[in-house]
Amino acid sequence: MNLTLYYLYWRFKLSKLYNTYLELKKKDKETIYLFKSGIFFISLDNDAYILSKLFHFKITNLTDTVVKCGFPCSSFNKYSHLFQLHHLSIKIIELENNALYSFNEYKQNQYVVDLLEFINSIDINSLSITDAYQFIEDLKNKVSKINKNGANI
């Protein structure tokens, strides 16, 4: 792919992202939208300025006219706690599957994904009886958090 086509491809992709942001803001100006893009959550335009002011995120240019800021997905738990402390209304857009989640829905989905990874990581052939009972107890505790807390994990 030559450089011009590459530039046009990214220009289209970024304008689509920004247009999605503008459409969401028309429906709900008060909510801050985070786009999950790869291993980062990014915020655009005015939302980026709000988050940058509160959490000292670095503002960078998405395009010549649109700014962004963000944080790594690995820091999600840290920032989710801070967002709640500041009573921010947050929604998350997963670009890979074009889904919009409330903040709590996203947290619950992530908890379930982590739970499934925990289950999948167990080598049942190497478990002793004691380890198996401990695994079942750990699993029971993790599942009970979903049942008790719903989305507020």
Give a label for each model feature:
Residues 2-121, 126-138, 142-153:
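Basic, polar low-complexity surface loops/patches
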